[in-house]
Structures are given as structure tokens and as C-alpha cells.
């Protein structure tokens, strides 16, 4: 799970973690956890915090070490691809703003992201996401594709 985080996210979480690891022993107490998460833009409820701690606090001592913290943050990040973020991503792909991502727009965006794809690979991506079979990806199809990753 933590292997899905970027190096930048890991560095950010390490900084956040060490910020609240007051005694420098490499662990974060349950009380500190909420503060840490809020500092990196997450906003968990008390119940969510408790659930997250219970999931990773293997020895039940109420503290979390850094690898456990990374795993937990990776889970949380995966769950919070907000609709707003997905809409922004869709709009980034939909260059002409017509509400659909064409093969050309997808190819253009993937090239910008450093992915050199063949026409066949682009067509395959469209086919996988194109539920209604019209040859392009609408917003609903894009959301389904993003949520399944």
C-alpha cells in the first residue's frame, strides 16, 4: 500500500510525522495522529482516527511507527480522490471542453505525462473505459475508471 505513494508524499509524511514525534522515538501517539493528518490536508473524524489506529497498531500500545503511518496514509489517500480532484483531472484531459475525452485528447495528455503510447494502446485505454461504446470517454466513465485504479 505504501509503495503507491510518491517519494514527495513520503517525504511530506515523514516531515509531518517527525514534527509530532515529540520525544523522537519514531512513534506517533494516537493523540498526535489527528494533528499530523490535518497538517497534510486530511480531515479525519475521531471515529476514523480510532479505526485507522486500530488497523495498524499491531501491538495495541496506542502508538504508530513510521512504516505503519505510511501504510495508513496511503490507504487514506486512496480513499480520498475527491470528486473535485477527479473533475479537475477530467477537465485537464478534455481540452476542447465538450464533455468528452477523445482518443486524440487522451494521447496528447498521456504524452504530456511522459507516457509514449501507440495508437493501439490509446484505443485500448478508450475501449476499457468507454462503457457506452461511443468511442470516447464521458465524465461518468472517467469517474468509474479513476475509482477502479
Swiss-Prot record:
Question: Keyword Metal-binding, does the record have it?
Answer: yes
Spell out the Pfam families in the cross-references: EF-hand_7 (PF13499)
Binding, Ca(2+) 3:
94, 96, 98, 105
CC annotations in GO: myosin II complex
Q: What else is known?
A: This protein has four functional calcium-binding sites.
Function of the protein: Calmodulin mediates the control of a large number of enzymes, ion channels and other proteins by Ca(2+). Among the enzymes to be stimulated by the calmodulin-Ca(2+) complex are a number of protein kinases and phosphatases.
Name by which UniProt lists this protein? Calmodulin
* Biological source species: Achlya klebsiana
**Gene for this protein?**
CMD1
Amino acid at each position: 500500500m505504501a509503495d503507491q505513494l510518491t517519494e514527495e508524499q513520503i517525504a511530506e509524511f515523514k516531515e509531518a510525522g517527525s514534527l509530532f514525534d515529540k520525544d523522537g522515538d519514531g512513534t506517533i501517539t494516537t493523540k498526535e495522529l489527528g494533528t499530523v493528518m490535518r497538517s497534510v490536508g486530511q480531515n479525519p473524524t475521531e471515529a476514523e482516527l480510532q479505526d485507522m489506529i486500530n488497523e495498524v497498531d499491531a501491538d495495541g500500545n496506542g502508538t504508530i511507527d513510521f512504516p505503519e503511518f505510511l501504510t495508513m496514509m496511503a490507504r487514506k489517500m486512496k480513499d480520498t480522490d475527491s470528486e473535485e480532484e477527479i473533475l479537475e483531472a477530467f477537465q485537464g484531459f478534455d481540452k476542447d471542453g465538450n464533455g468528452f475525452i477523445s482518443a486524440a485528447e487522451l494521447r496528447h495528455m498521456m504524452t504530456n505525462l511522459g507516457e509514449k503510447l501507440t495508437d493501439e494502446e490509446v484505443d485500448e485505454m478508450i475501449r476499457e473505459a468507454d462503457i457506452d461504446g461511443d468511442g470516447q470517454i464521458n465524465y461518468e466513465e472517467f469517474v468509474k475508471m479513476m475509482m477502479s485504479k
